[in-house]
């Protein structure tokens, strides 16, 4: 190849790199304005989310407003979305209220909210996301926690009732595996969808847990996510079945996984609230989600 041709190719490559760099810089445009969410609370009427929003800095390159976006657990960024839930003028400090939508497909209880600006084409986040910090106010069971009479406890299986009574423990831990509970016989509606649970398994837990409660024994549930061929959406997205894994990480990275996982937890919390006659008023006082979360074989992903 002649020297002039090599030079031309080098120059052409340099031009291409410069153009690419320019586009990259444009795409990664930063703004001088920042925004923050001071608080994110369920309102006193328990039907709104009240969000305190403030901002400061130069609004150059924006339309002079701060927009508020809702992100579900399976959404990592605003992306190309335009469906903001509220907006305020830049530089203002205001509290905006949006519907909580509890009990509907648009339920915002598990969502987080992020402030953004608009440059005429794209919305860009300019502050940290914020979750609701008082979700407990909409819990159906508002009873105070009952402290066990003694710290003496036992991690047991369902067939170890007599051991617990003989040893005089006042605190037991029970394992609950996701795969056991899904099935048929009990229909449960949550946020507009119907989910199906294994009636015989649920009733077995009802009997055991209510028996403990009758003996004034506090119950802690350890909820475990074992592999379920019928419901692969429950396992963290992208995870393959492994012979070396005992349990898997819960999946909230996809919409289907999040919604099913949320419904199972809601069913368990409702069933074992101590106020549900269907479970003979069985009550679980403490919940542990997962086991040894920093150990791969126990929370594989």
Regions found by a protein language model. Name each.
Residues 77, 123, 129-289, 293-301:
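N-terminal substrate-binding region of glycoside hydrolase catalytic domains
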Residues 1-9:
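Bacterial N-terminal signal peptides that target proteins for export
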Residues 19-30:
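Sec-dependent signal peptide cleavage junction
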Residues 28-140:
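Beta-strand-enriched, solvent-exposed domains that form extended recognition/catalytic surfaces
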Residues 11-20:
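Bacterial N-terminal signal peptides
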